[in-house]
Structure formats: structure tokens, C-alpha cells
Amino acid sequence: MGVTGILQLPRDRFKRTSFFLWVIILFQRTFSIPLGVIHNSTLQVSDVDKLVCRDKLSSTNQLRSVGLNLEGNGVATDVPSATKRWGFRSGVPPKVVNYEAGEWAENCYNLEIKKPDGSECLPAAPDGIRGFPRCRYVHKVSGTGPCAGDFAFHKEGAFFLYDRLASTVIYRGTTFAEGVVAFLILPQAKKDFFSSHPLREPVNATEDPSSGYYSTTIRYQATGFGTNETEYLFEVDNLTYVQLESRFTPQFLLQLNETRYTSGKRSNTTGKLIWKVNPEIDTTIGEWAFWETKKNLTRKIRSEELSFTAVSNRAKNISGQSPARTSSDPGTNTTTEDHKIMASENSSAMVQVHSQGREAAVSHLTTLATISTSLRPPITKPGPDNSTHNTPVYKLDISEATQVEQHHRRTDNASTTSDTPPATTAAGPLKAENTNTSKGTDLLDPATTTSPQNHSETAGNNNTHHQDTGEESASSGKLGLITNTIAGVAGLITGGRRTRREAIVNAQPKCNPNLHYWTTQDEGAAIGLAWIPYFGPAAEGIYIEGLMHNQDGLICGLRQLANETTQALQLFLRATTELRTFSILNRKAIDFLLQRWGGTCHILGPDCCIEPHDWTKNITDKIDQIIHDFVDKTLPDQGDNDNWWTGWRQWIPAGIGVTGVIIAVIALFCICKFVF
């Protein structure tokens, strides 16, 4: 009766009934009951999957390879410290692996080192290997070194991350970041996992900086690269340098570069001039949180003495540090100049010190700091030949200025010979002061500052800005481009303001809580385990933003797991390499033995005295540490089956599906009842 009645329905009622049936079918498919049958080919859920991944791996499409930067572990990123983690070695071929996703890197490196004879230390990058695409600061090091080996490897077993490729060696002139490669297991394979709008590079300096990407190149000169006596110089221009120290942050170096240009304290001769910073100077000036959109704002800086000592070339010859860096005048001898004359003694330039994007301690107050220059009496120091020479010490006093917001842009067409400061005052020349007088109190009149064109002339040969470094004022309040720490995700979505990055107290923390990923503010696209950027392969040269959502501590644990696993695998690699070498030597010995009937050591000599080391204890310790950190420690909401929520929440989808089916049956019954 029912079936016959349905078949005899009028056309309009049949359409209405069919519509309801399709709605019910779609509803049931959306909340379907899991009816799959587990068989032998189904991948089993391991303890690590339960504790860390919180899902089973049912398809390889759920795997995503991720490059994690070492700086997230809290390692030192300054050039003197970072280069100590690299070393040259021969006899080990390089290995290259690919990865799909990565992090924004605050510090990247680019090396161009030559041997004393002028030959290259590092190999050229093979076809297809490009520089790491997302670096806030690129530390470009040029110079010389002995380079005792064919390739430069990482002493701690990490990779050198390039654009979607990770290599075990450093390539010449190619930007890289230090890191490891790990794999994420996604809750379920989705083709649109990384779908979002592409990140477009800004084409000019007038675009909104919130849609652009910023990168700054900082140049250094090195002598004795790869040795314990390596010396580094921060390059202001081709002739002016500052002795580099581990305590110098990139932001401080940028301010230092700005100060050297605007105060006119650069070499005005044809020889090199080296400055040394007062060891009591606070080098955290200008430091700002990771990957905030850079704003060329000014902030209140406490009054302090910022002094530089000019180091004579007679006392320290640095002429041979870089064959690539020579004087513009080929007929000039750069090794015999004693450069004590930097600028005219009546120089009264007032310059700006930019905070490079970090908010002021008092968020609502922004000030323009000024530096007044004055000369101290020359200091007489004995030279290496027991002679004396005068070394001037320039005292730079920083004082408060009026509350202004500076909007000017920096371009790349810099002049390396101009000593014109980017900002001067018409309020009258500064009064010269000696070491016994109080600091200057002259203020900068914002109405009399020079135009941005003057600033562009002395922007500096050192720092190459791929994008305007200052577009927004201090009062704009707009958040960073598309980057934030995981701890600040809520602030990103709700529009809250970021706070300054806290100092890392422990020298070697287990994990840095301030992890920074390429993200998007589209909360609707959030799925998965962590905030991960995607470097392709949607289109060549176009980078896709992707959002993965997770609790704060999970990706931190994944990072540490990848780091410790990589170290253990590096020990395996070393043992395997030695075994391979040992086997080759044995093969050669056997070949010679069959031909010459001589003993192995008699034929090979000292080369036969090699044996593979036993790294079992080290590898076991690493594995035990991983088990202790991730298996023995239960993550939140991951208790045993006695936990009601943990044990029963897996039935929630099934319950919803059953409820949907019941509702569908009742609805169908009501429709039939209504029709008949």
C-alpha cells in the first residue's frame, strides 16, 4: 500500500518527497556511522599516535613533512655562535631531502668564503636549490678561512634548510636556515588543507606593509673562518667596520649602522676604519618581537652613553680578510692608513635612533631620540712598535626629544660616500661639550627635519631592504603581517596587541614557547595539529599560506622529538659511514692480498688502522630520552580508558549519526502519514 501510494503520488508531491529524502541522505552522509571493517592491511594505532598525534594514520596522504628551525629551540643565532656549530669535513657525500612546510626564520645565513689562495671553500648550489624563502634577517658573511674539508656540515646533526629542500651541507652564496625535518600526521587527508590566498611580494615601497614581506641583509667580514681564532667585522660600508660581538642583536646592528651613517662617523679616506663598541652599552636597544610588521616608529630611550673607539689599522691589520672587498681606488694602499679623522670636529649632526618595530615601554608614548656628538681629548695608546698614536673616542649622548611620529621610507639607491645625516635640525648647532659637562638637552624640531630623500641617500650599502622598512606610524595599532606566536594566537584572532618577547632564562631550554609560523587569520580554515606554512607546490615561486590549529605544547613537543630523533639518526649515519669506509678498506686489502700475497696492513700501511666506533650507548640514551619525554608522560586529555570523557567521546560521532538516522525515519514516517 505504501509503495504503491508513493508511486502514484502527484508530480508536485513527488518532488517534495524526493527533496526531503535527499536532505535526509545528505544529513546521514555528513554524520555517518563508522561501518568500516578493520582488516590486516589497516595500519594500527601506536602509543605515539595516541599520545602525540591523537589520530590513526590510515593513508600516506595524512603525512606532511615539516622543516623546523633550530632557533625555536633557543639556540644562539648570532654569527659568531652559529658558525661554531658548522665544520668542514671530507669523505662524506652530501644528502638532500625535500620537505613541504616550514617556519618563518628570524635569522638566516649566507656564506661566501675563500681559501687563502683565492679558491672557493664552499660548493655551488646544484640546480633546483634556492635560498630559504622567509628570512627576517639574512647574515651574509664574506671572508677567508683554511676550510679543511670538502664540505661544511652541521656538527650537531641538523640540516641546512633551503627552499623546500634540506641538505647536510652549506652551498656557496645560497641563503639557508638551520633546522630539522619532521613529519606531521593530520587527522584526515584533505586536499584543501593548505588552501588560502597566495602571499604576494610587494612591488613598490608605497603598498600597505601589512600585505608585504620584509627581509634585511646584514653583511660581515670574517678572517680565519672555521677556526678558533675567527674574527668578525660588521660592515657599515666598504671602508667602515665595527668589531662584532656575540651580544649584538640584528636590531642593534641596524641601529648601529644608522648611527654610523647619520653621525658621519665613517671613513672619509681610502683606507679601512674599524670601530669598537663600548662593552657597557646595552645591545638590546631596538630589539623587537619576532616577525612583527616593521614600523618605523620612534620610542622613548633612556639616556645613556654610547661610545665608539676607533681601532687603528697599524695596531691590527685586517687588509687580507676578504679578497672580494677592496678599495675603490686600485692604486691606494689600504694597509698603511692610520684613520683617525672621521668627521669635522665641529660636526653637530643630530640623528634618529629607530626602535626597528618594537613597541615602546610606554605604549602610548613615542619619542624621537637624538644623538649629539662631541669629542673627548685624544687617548694616547702604545702601538705594537712601542710607538704612540692618538685614538679619538667619540661620545654619543642619547637624550629625549619631542613626541613625534616619523614617516619616512628607505630605498636601495644608497650612496656609500655621502656623509649627509638623514635628519638635521634648524634649531641651531649643538654646543660642544666635554666629558665633565652634562648631556645635551637640545630637542629636535619635527617641523625642521629633512625630507626622506636625504635619508635615502645614506640608507647604507650594508643593509638591503627588499621592502620599505617603515610604512606605518606608531599609532596605527595594526598587527603583524601573518605571523604570531602560538601563545599569541588568541590575540591574533581577536585583534589584541602583541607584547615584547620575553628573554630566555635557561641557556638551553627544552622548547622555546615563542614559536613562529606562517599563518593566516582565516579561522575557518583551521584544522590539523599545528600552525604550519606551506612552501608549495601549488605554483613555482608562489607561496601558499596554510593554517593548522593546535594547543600550545604539542608542536613544542614535536620539535623536541624531531631534534632528538635527528641527533640519534646522525649517530647512525656516522656509524654507517665508518662501517662503509672500513668495508672499502677491507675490499682493497683483499684485492691486494690476492694479487700480491701480502698482508693488509703491510700493503695499506696506517690506513688499515681504522675500526668503526660503537655508538650503541649514545643511540640508546637518545631513544630512552624520547620514550621518557613522550611515551611515559601523558598529554592533557589523554588518560586511560577509565576516563569517562576519553573513553566515551569517541562514540559522539556515532551517536550523532544514529540520532540523524532516527530523525530521518521519523520524518519519512510523518511525510508518508501526511501524504496518505
Curated annotation (Swiss-Prot):
Extracellular compartment ranges equal 33-650
Report what the Swiss-Prot or TrEMBL entry states about this protein's PTMs. Answer: The signal peptide region modulates GP's high mannose glycosylation, thereby determining the efficiency of the interactions with DC-SIGN(R).
Outcome reported for the amino acid change (mutating residue 474 to T): In strain: Isolate Bouee-96
Alphabetized, the UniProt keywords read: Clathrin-mediated endocytosis of virus by host, Cleavage on pair of basic residues, Coiled coil, Disulfide bond, Fusion of virus membrane with host endosomal membrane, Fusion of virus membrane with host membrane, Glycoprotein, Host cell membrane, Host membrane, Host-virus interaction, Inhibition of host innate immune response by virus, Inhibition of host tetherin by virus, Lipoprotein, Membrane, Palmitate, Secreted, Signal, Transmembrane, Transmembrane helix, Viral attachment to host cell, Viral attachment to host entry receptor, Viral envelope protein, Viral immunoevasion, Viral penetration into host cytoplasm, Virion, Virus endocytosis by host, Virus entry into host cell
Site (described: Involved in receptor recognition and/or post-binding events): 57, 63-64, 88, 95, 170
- Compositional bias of kind Polar residues: 314-335, 447-464
Protein's name according to its UniProt entry: Envelope glycoprotein
* Originating species: Zaire ebolavirus (strain Gabon-94)
Q: What is the lineage of its organism?
A: Viruses, Riboviria, Orthornavirae, Negarnaviricota, Haploviricotina
